[in-house]
Amino acid sequence: MHVLHTFANNDSVPYLTWFAERARREGDPRYTFLVMYPKRPRMIDEMRALGFSVEWIPYDDRQRKRGMLFALPRLWWYMRRYRPDVVHSNLFDDSLPGMIAAWLAGINVRVVTKQDTGFHWMHAPRWMRLDRLISRMATHVIAISDECERFLIERECADPKKVVRIHNGIPPAAFTQQDPSLMEQLRARFAIAGKGPIIGTVARFIEWKGYRYIIGAAARIVKQHPDARFLLCGTGGQENEIRNLVSQSGLDAHVIFTGWVDRKEMASFYGLLDIYLHAAILEPFGLVYAEAMMNGVPVVSTPTGAALDAIVDGKNGILVNERSAEALALGVERMLSADARGMGAAGKETALRMYHFNVMWEGTIDLYRRALDKQR
C-alpha cells in the first residue's frame, strides 16, 4: 500500500514521523511526502533517513492564493509521477490544492484529516465555502474529535457517510518520562519553589486559546491562594497583549511566561503542575490535553476537543463553560477541594486508552485498507 501525504506550513511534523517509523518497522505502508514550505524542510532529511521519498514545493502562506495556485500543478505532477494508492492531506493550505490535484490525477482514495476545523468559521467565514469544497473532493474525511465531527456535518455540510472519527494520538513513552533533576532545574528557572498551587497551560498566544479568560481566572484565584503561580507556555501574536493584561491586573508576581520549553522537557514541565488549565474555544483536538492527562495532571478545561471526548466532569477531570473567567476559577476551586490526585490518575487511564498512538495508527490504516478494498 502506497500512501502519499501532503502537508503545509510545517517543516517537521511529529505524528507523520511516528507513522513513518511505525511503517518502517512493519514494512507497510510505503510513504511519500509532499511538503509545502518556504524553505527546504527538515522533513526531507528525516523521512529519507527512514527510507521514504520527500518532495519540497516552495510555499509561503503570506501569499496564500498565489502560493496554492503555484503548488497545484506541482502536486498534480508528483501524484502522477508516484501514482499512490491513497492521497492524504492534513491542513487547509495543502488540502485545497491537494484534493483537487489528487482528483485530477485520478487517485481514487482521497483522505483529508481536518486538523484545523473551525478556524475559518471563527476568523474568516468567506473561506468556509472552500472548506466545504475540500470535503466534497475527498472520499473520506477524518474528524479528530466528536465536536469536530459535528462541526463538519452541521456547518461544513460534509456527507456523514464520508466522515470517520479517529482521534489524534501520541506515543506515551515519548511524553511521560519525567526527570526529577530536570524538574528541579525548571522550578528554579521559573522561581516557583515553595509556591503553589502551580497551574499551567500550554498553548499558542492566539485569541481562541482563551488566555484572556485564564488571566481573569487568575485574578480571582490569587485572592484565595496568594502563593498560586500560573505557568503560561507558548508563543504567538497575542503574547504582548496578554503580558499587558497581566500587568494591568496586578498579576506580575503570579504569572510566569515560560518562553520556549524544549519538547524533551515537556514531561518534566507537566510534572511541576498541580492543575492543567485550558480555556480554548472550539479546539479541533488539542494534543496538550492528552499530554497532560497521560502525565497524571488533573485537568480543568472548557468543553472542547479531546477534553470534551475524554473527561466525565468530576470523575477524571473538570469541565467548565467557555469564555468565562469566573467558570475557570470555580473549576480550579472545585479541583483543589476534590481528590485531585485520584482525578489525575483516572484521567491518565482514560488518555492512555483513548489517545495512545497505537489507536490512531490502527484506525488510520484500517480506513485505508477498507477504502482500497472497495476499489477492487
Language-model segments: residues:
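N-terminal strand-loop element at the rim of the active site
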Residues: 5-70, 237
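Short hydrophobic beta-strand element within catalytic cores of glycosyltransferases
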Residues: 298-301, 311
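A conserved mid-protein helix/loop that constitutes part of the nucleotide-sugar donor-binding site
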Residues: 13-21, 197, 201-223, 237-243, ...
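Conserved acidic donor-binding segment of nucleotide-sugar-dependent glycosyltransferases
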Residues: 313-314, 318-325, 334-339
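Short His-centered aromatic/hydrophobic patch
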Residues: 89-95, 114
